[in-house]
């Protein structure tokens, strides 16, 4: 059964821009020097600030730009929660997953993301991991072409059928 996605995601038109979207619910300053040293450009959410520093553009969580940034991202670097990961797959975005420590669901999500060839997982971002991820973007993009993105009708039909069987 495919994931249920919010309508705002289903309405988006995915493009492949230049920026990599970084989304962290808890700021981790240790990743900033790694991102700065990279030749890529990043749009970063989760550091409770806005502004630009070299190749990094900071935006606050809840920004009105978020959905547009997600739709136009070249790739995603984020924790491995189900919602964002599902949205990224729907939009065919390669994903570097940083599962939250001791969160089994996130570790499992990240494991399968990597196993299916849609991205990589790592416990901690390093320059080597980032370089490896960036070098494999075209491989992940090609693999994502085989992902069968669906609207919510299939999932809702399965849920309706299951509820009727239980009643």
Name each model feature, range by range.
Residues 24, 30-61:
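Catalytic donor nucleotide-activated moiety binding site of glycosyltransferases and closely related
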């Amino acid at each position: 059964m495919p994931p249920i996605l919010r309508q705002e995601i289903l309405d988006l038109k995915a493009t492949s821009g230049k920026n990599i979207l970084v989304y962290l619910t808890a700021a981790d300053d240790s990743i900033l020097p790694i991102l700065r040293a990279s030749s890529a450009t990043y749009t970063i959410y989760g550091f409770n600030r806005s502004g630009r520093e070299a190749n990094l553009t900071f935006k606050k969580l809840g920004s009105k730009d978020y959905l547009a940034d997600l739709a136009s991202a070249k790739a995603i670097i984020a924790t491995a929660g189900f919602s964002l990961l599902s949205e990224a797959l729907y939009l065919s975005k390669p994903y570097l997953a940083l599962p939250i420590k001791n969160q089994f669901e996130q570790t499992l999500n990240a494991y399968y993301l990597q196993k299916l060839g849609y991205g990589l997982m790592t416990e901690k971002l390093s320059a080597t991991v980032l370089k490896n991820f960036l070098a494999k973007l075209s491989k992940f993009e090609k693999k994502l072409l085989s992902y069968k993105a669906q609207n919510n009708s299939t999932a809702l039909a399965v849920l309706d059928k299951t509820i009727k069987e239980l009643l």
